[in-house]
Curated annotation (Swiss-Prot):
GO CC term, one of those recorded: cytoplasm
EC number, as in UniProt: 2.3.1.286
Binding site for NAD(+): 19-38, 102-105, 193-195, 219-221, 237
Function noted in UniProt: NAD-dependent protein deacetylase which modulates the activities of several proteins which are inactive in their acetylated form.
Subcellular location: Cytoplasm
UniProt xrefs under PANTHER family: NAD-DEPENDENT PROTEIN DEACYLASE (PTHR11085:SF4), NAD-DEPENDENT PROTEIN DEACYLASE SIRTUIN-5, MITOCHONDRIAL-RELATED (PTHR11085)
Stated name of the protein: NAD-dependent protein deacylase 2
Catalytic activity: N(6)-acetyl-L-lysyl-[protein] + NAD(+) + H2O = 2''-O-acetyl-ADP-D-ribose + nicotinamide + L-lysyl-[protein]
Positions bound to Zn(2+): C130, C133, C152, C155
UniProt cross-references to Gene3D superfamilies, sorted A to Z: SIR2/SIRT2 'Small Domain (3.30.1600.10), TPP-binding domain (3.40.50.1220)
Disulfide bonds: none
Organism: Pseudomonas syringae pv. tomato (strain ATCC BAA-871 / DC3000)
Keywords: Cytoplasm, Metal-binding, NAD, Transferase, Zinc
Length: 248
């Protein structure tokens, strides 16, 4: 841990990559899926990749929204944990520290991470927006208590959250921001609670290693990336992040 703290202390530009494991201590499941909520088939007999997809939202919005609502209720029912607050503290200490998250729970924002240095690569749950007229609606929690799918109060169109469902493209602006920052480079990358091998996850790690920077991972179990890291801390982020930041 002291090696990681020393490297982060001396680094100017830092990227913190976070996945579903970070929010496990907030009570959210870590199964694979949008927001890390599902694994395998749904109770409707469909793979979650089909039920919670862009095409399904268009074809059968009521079915798709059934699972969006479960995701929404899980996220709204939790709150940021000590690791989210520690990351926000690191961003206050280091004005060029960025967060790249796969999570859609909004906990980084709630914990105080500055939105201008937060890349939510899978989007976020709110505000909802109308697929017909694009009007925004901030009342996610209220809609989850009503019949689904939620409808636009202006035109009656079907609302949706700005999350990336299965078979949908990543948000263009988030990708642009990520690769703009990657072009500048990072002195250190800290990966927390993610097992994903998507290019936008492992590319920052590889680029930073190649350029001579420092890489570290915090995860309860080793991942495909662990052996390539300078430091691997096998634990939950909530158990170590506050202490790690206290040494910076």
């Amino acid at each position: 841990m002291l090696q990681a703290a020393s490297a982060l202390r001396h680094a100017k530009r830092i990227l913190v990559i976070t996945g579903a494991g970070l929010s496990a201590d907030s009570g959210l499941p870590t199964y694979r899926g949008v927001g890390g909520l599902y694994n395998g088939e749904t109770e409707d007999g469909l793979p979650i990749e089909m039920a919670l997809s862009g095409p399904m939202l268009r074809r059968d919005p009521e079915l798709c929204w059934k699972y969006i609502a479960e995701l929404g209720k899980a996220c709204l029912g939790g709150e940021p944990n000590v690791a989210h607050y520690a990351i926000a503290q690191l961003q206050r200490i280091k004005p060029e520290c960025w967060v790249l998250t796969q999570n859609v729970d909004g906990y980084h924002r709630a914990a105080g991470s500055p939105p201008e240095r937060l890349i939510e690569i899978h989007g976020q749950l709110s505000p909802l927006f109308c697929q017909s007229c694009a009007a925004q609606d901030p009342q996610l929690s209220e809609h989850l208590q009503r019949p689904l799918p939620p409808l636009c109060r202006l035109c009656g169109g079907i609302l949706r959250p700005p999350v990336v469902l299965f078979q949908e493209m990543l948000p263009e602006r988030a990708l642009e921001t990520l690769y703009e920052q990657l072009a500048t480079g990072y002195d250190a990358v800290l990966s927390i609670g993610t097992t994903a091998s998507f290019p936008y996850i492992h590319e920052p790690v590889i680029r930073t290693r190649v350029s001579g920077g420092f890489t570290a991972e915090i995860n309860p179990q080793p991942t495909d990336h662990s052996a390539q890291m300078d430091v691997f801390l096998q634990c939950r982020a909530a158990h170590v992040m506050a202490e790690l930041i206290s040494h910076i």
